[in-house]
Amino acid sequence: MLNNRACKVGAFLMALFFVITYLLPLNGRLLWQPDETRYAEISREMLQRGDWIVPYLLDIRYFEKPVAGYWINNISQWIFGDNNFAVRFGSVFCIFISAILLYRLAMMMWHNRHIAFATSLIYISMFLVFAIGTYSVLDPMFSLWVTAAMMCSFWGLKTDCTRRRIMAYLVLGLCCGMGFMTKGFLALAVPVIVMLPIVIYQKRVLQIVCFGPLAIISAIAISLPWVIAIALREPDYWHYFFWVEHIKRFSSDDAQHIAPFWYYIPILILGVIPWLGLLPGAVMKSWKERKSNPEMFFLLCWFVVPLLFFSIAKGKLPTYILPCMAPLAMMMAKFGVDCVKNGKMELLKINGMVNVFLGLLAVIVLFAMEVVTKHALYQPSEWLKWVLAIVAFGIWGIIGYLCFALNGKYWLLAAFCSIVVSLVIGHALPENTVNSKLPQNFIKLHHQELAGSRYILSESVGLATSVAWEMKRSDIYMFERWGELEYGLNYPDSRYRYISYKDFPQWLAKARKEGRVSVLFHLYKDEKLPDLPKADQISRNYRFAILVYEKQP
């Protein structure tokens, strides 16, 4: 067990790691479209309208998600303003709270500060957690509520005090209710399918029958006011959200983001870096101790069952398995601390060598792509970015070697492998990536034209939300492609916000009498601009393009 001085040093180092990797780079990195610009704009419009009940995007009804995740982003923008830091801070905050909850859960399970500290550090330094936790999506919020729900579930199973058990199930319901208002019915399904094998194996079914209704009551109590409010405001919301967003997305043949069953295996392998060397041992240890150690069986079910559930679903995205990383971090922490305790340092040294290999592999690939192959990531003028990337991954390998050379004694140093990568990634992205996925610079370059435009049209929803966020205006028209706004654009009061190629010439002739018209495109690499009326100004930067039509009498 750690002494007080070691605890203070460990807490300081973890806080330093969190500040350097999670907070410092936030504002300096451009926003990615379509996700980050979408959530930035939704919250900006919510704050502008003062309506926290019905989500809108570009002043068009947007029913893909409930509102609790937006509320967190709203508060962030309300405190920090309209900037990239505020857009991402909600995600960072949720990862931070999740790490604290995992520390507390580890203490509940093992009463060992070393394991608890290692759990939190491993969690926040996992590549998947870091990548999603510094990216503005709703998954960190959803993962927070799932983590809190599972902590309450364990608390309810462990305590012998009836009063505390009642409290645990009531808080469990509150967490599920907030998770439901963040990402829908998944927040209710995940804790249930995880706890089912646990209570059956531990013969606690009667406890769930007796106390489970308390969780249901508290979940309904916290979510019902908003459920009723949005049903009164938008009667069609629940039809769309249940049938389209849940049933169609996860089970139908035309579900979004269809991927094979094994899709999450490579995602998981990459996601646990820089702790990949601990993955096999941690899972095997949990499986071997499933009978003798109820805590390990609890974590194993929490990790495996949602992973299988999301693998069976037809629609898949890397962000979906973020809730699986919390139990995996705890399993790895227990495995690592037990290795030190039992003198099995060679198992920890393996993780160091894995990071040496990963750092060296990244350096070789970067060097080969620029020097040997014809598939260069960077342009010749971007040599400094190339050097930055090589240095970052070189330091990754060096830290991995230190973990190995020091005989695994300082195995937790592996967390710092990615620290330089996190600091430089925003400055080391190739220009072709910036000019295809991060439109803020392109929009700022054409700020004058856009600011003086009476109408702005966009062929891409991601580009439309980027313009809306940068220009602080939500009256962007969709051009030819409906995208994710199709459902909202079909409402009678929003149909005028869609212009097709066929109708554009006639619409343009009328619109130019009112003022300048700007049309934005997000093209494929070699795609040509469509055949449209001749513009007064055309500008293209790799995949982004703008056509400007000046006002005519």
From Swiss-Prot:
Protein name: Undecaprenyl phosphate-alpha-4-amino-4-deoxy-L-arabinose arabinosyl transferase
Principal localisation: membrane
PANTHER family: MANNOSYLTRANSFERASE YKCB-RELATED (PTHR33908), UNDECAPRENYL PHOSPHATE-ALPHA-4-AMINO-4-DEOXY-L-ARABINOSE ARABINOSYL TRANSFERASE (PTHR33908:SF3)
Subcellular compartments: Cell inner membrane
Role: Catalyzes the transfer of the L-Ara4N moiety of the glycolipid undecaprenyl phosphate-alpha-L-Ara4N to lipid A. The modified arabinose is attached to lipid A and is required for resistance to polymyxin and cationic antimicrobial peptides.
Induction of the gene: Activated by low magnesium concentrations, via the two-component regulatory system PhoP/PhoQ.
Entry's Gene Ontology molecular function annotations: 4-amino-4-deoxy-L-arabinose transferase activity; mannosyltransferase activity
EC number(s) stated in the UniProt entry for this protein: 2.4.2.43
Similarity comment text for this entry: Belongs to the glycosyltransferase 83 family.
Keyword Transferase included in the entry's annotation: yes
Source species, domain of life: Bacteria
Organism: Photorhabdus laumondii subsp. laumondii (strain DSM 15139 / CIP 105565 / TT01)
Reaction catalysed by this enzyme: 4-amino-4-deoxy-alpha-L-arabinopyranosyl di-trans,octa-cis-undecaprenyl phosphate + lipid IVA = lipid IIA + di-trans,octa-cis-undecaprenyl phosphate
Keyword Flavoprotein attached: no
Sequence intervals crossing the membrane: 6-26, 89-109, 115-135, 180-200, 208-228, 258-278, 293-313, 317-337, 352-372, 386-406, 410-430
